[in-house]
From Swiss-Prot:
It comes from Thermosynechococcus vestitus (strain NIES-2133 / IAM M-273 / BP-1). One of its GO terms (cellular component) is cytoplasm. This is Large ribosomal subunit protein bL33. One of its GO terms (molecular function) is structural constituent of ribosome. Belongs to the bacterial ribosomal protein bL33 family. Pfam families: Ribosomal_L33 (PF00471). The keyword Ribonucleoprotein applies. Keywords: Ribonucleoprotein, Ribosomal protein. PROSITE patterns: RIBOSOMAL_L33. GO terms for biological process: translation.
Amino acid sequence: MAKAKGARIIITLECTECRTNPAQRSPGVSRYTTTKNRRTTTGRLELKKFCRYCNKHTIHREIK
């Protein structure tokens, strides 16, 4: 018998301020990788994490 596909998937979180503010001169965009349960969290994940380019805690959203 084939094993069922797991519920956990690996996702990437990206800083929203680095991406949307082109006037701010930053060397890059902050990205974190984490896992989420596909069955319990169906929508896009949004967490407050530290961005080393903005040098503050910002909202990081899930990207595809």
